[in-house]
Amino acid sequence: IPLTLDSGNNDHSIESAEERSLTLELVTQSLEISNSSTAKESTQPNPIDGINLIRVDGVLPCPMLSADAPAILLPKRLGFQSVLSHPLGISPWADPSDPLAPLALDRLGDGPLLLQLFVRGNPFQANRSIREPWTDAIQQLIDLNRLFGLVVYGSPYVWEALSALLPSSIPAAYSPGQMPDAQQQLLQRLLNPDPSPALSRLGINEFTD
């Protein structure tokens, strides 16, 4: 079912309770979750101390990813430090043409890596896959036992291609929508973070100059 929600507006003050309920129902029904139990079992009092690598098309503007977006704050509850990858920033790639080690992991830091991709259309056309070889990157992370989980927002083509690479031990999820509601519903099911700690808006890094 196509969603016609405004991804740039997370203010629900003009929605009635019935409209709000319908919105969340549509979002929830559109989600696809795989192997979420692994992530839930990983929830623990001690921070995971991992990397939340978020890929977006751009940040000027980026309405679906404000400083308080669920894609940033919910992983933060588990101890993930967010890092943004976007066209105007420094590339996270060491050598995109190297199928064994395309990601520059020395720039990202140590620990498990949660990969969230905000993509639209089919980036496997028009040589986009050469510039952003996420298939090879995921295999690189799997081989190093560093891939904590995969989330794809938007493109079903990317989800289909990347989720097929994952072993059953790695949690993954897909949402056709990219709005904050979709992030919230998806990550709550995938990560099951402890809702009790107060959230901070700090702790966001970017690949920028």
Question: Whereabouts are the PLM-identified features?
Answer:
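Preference for extracellular/luminal or secreted protein segments
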Residues: 1-209
